[in-house]
Design a protein with these regions (language model features):
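Terminal amphipathic alpha-helical/low-complexity segments used for targeting or macromolecular assembly
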Residues: 1-64, 125, 131-132, 138-144, ...
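Short, conserved clusters of charged catalytic residues that mark active-site
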Residues: 44, 166, 184
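Flexible, glycine/small-residue-enriched loop-and-beta-strand segment within the central core
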Residues: 68-83, 88-176, 202-203, 210-217
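A generic "structured core" feature
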Residues: 172, 182-184, 188
Length: 229
């Protein structure tokens, strides 16, 4: 009987596909721009990954999604995870329900989203960059008891459509981020963010408005965005 490890070592096509899968897992926006000669095997691979996830967790995955096998996605009855069409979840991202992502939402590498009890909702087309943290719960911090013994509270988080959450940014429980807003890299959002606002800093504050920066945009690209931040 042929040893699978030996066959893998001797077959350059298998080695190429394994490396290509790793590349897609860490940069999933590339999946949506695959050339036809790669799309068939990549879609078959994703069908296997997603079927295994559905069999073990309370998740709903819309058509055309990409889920890295290295991602950690956990849903329970009443605390499920729902991904709309053409969403992507990169390697080492952590998702825990209740969580609902609209169509074409991207969650990049090492981002963490936990819905607590009240849940997280993310609107269509929003980008959540690498290392971002969105936690819909917090601990009591009364001085007369250890933090570990105090109650956990959850009010929920709502993030609108076409929002960009920058790398290593944090969104705290109870916050609403309006449509088209931008949260800068490393910002910590503790209050609601208006639509179109650009916020930065710790704690985050409004530093601009997307509509006032026409020079930093451009015509929409064709298909799925190819940037990864």
């Amino acid at each position: 009987m042929e040893n699978p490890e030996e066959a893998f070592a001797e077959d350059p096509l298998l080695r190429f596909r394994a490396q290509h899968q790793k590349r897609l897992s860490w940069m999933p926006w590339l999946y949506f721009a695959l050339k036809p000669r790669h799309r068939s095997w990549a879609e078959a691979w994703q069908a296997e990954v997603q079927a295994a996830l559905r069999a073990l967790e309370t998740v709903e995955l819309g058509p055309g999604c990409f889920v890295a096998p290295e991602a950690a996605i956990f849903g329970e009855p009443g605390r499920g995870v729902v991904l709309g069409a053409r969403c992507s979840v990169a390697a080492h991202a952590f998702l825990h329900g209740p969580l609902r992502l609209g169509d074409e939402v991207s969650v990049n590498a090492r981002a963490s989203l936990d819905g607590g009890r009240a849940g997280i909702e993310v609107g269509r087309g929003t980008r959540i960059a690498a290392g971002a943290t969105v936690y819909a719960f917090d601990h009591g911090i009364a001085p007369d008891h250890p933090v570990r013994t105090q109650p956990v509270r959850s009010r929920g988080i709502r993030i609108g459509e076409d929002v960009w959450i920058g790398a290593n940014a944090g969104i705290t429980d109870g916050v609403t981020v309006g449509d088209h807003a931008v949260v800068a890299m490393g910002a910590v959002v503790t209050q609601d963010v208006p639509a179109w606002a650009i916020v930065a800093g710790v704690p985050a504050r409004v530093v601009g408005d997307r509509r006032a920066r026409p020079d930093q945009g451009g015509a929409p690209g064709q298909g799925f965005p190819t940037d990864g931040v």
